[in-house]
């Protein structure tokens, strides 16, 4: 296991934990699972997990991006990844993937992104933003219709989310910002026929 830091889009250094088998080559040939969360000030502390061993034994690298929105670097780190700074969370994660490619841990199209709940929001946003970076995405209970949820104050969790994501119903700035990244609102459906011209 190694801990490195990489530069994000704005020059901030972001921690990244990389776990791999000692026989796994760093020549760009390995598949890689990149985990991220980045919300509510929850830190993704490095820890042992026996469930990861099956992947690591198969030459799959496990990396955890300690992106803004968590509190790995304190309260300011959290604030730089919430409300109208939420896009820093997504940029940090995308730059983690780019760092792993540039440093030959993996290659473009060999990364599986993984996150759940608010980490599912992260997955939806980053796959919309940089689809070519990923082989696939694993979303566990994803929060992908974040704008519609935020607009419905009758839902039991919505009002409690205002401190993290903002209040889109009563604040146009928050509405516009959430709309700009909300996975559901930013999906495009492409269809084609066998001979589209």
Give the location of each predicted region.
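Cap/lid segment of the alpha/beta-hydrolase catalytic domain
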Residues: 1-109, 116
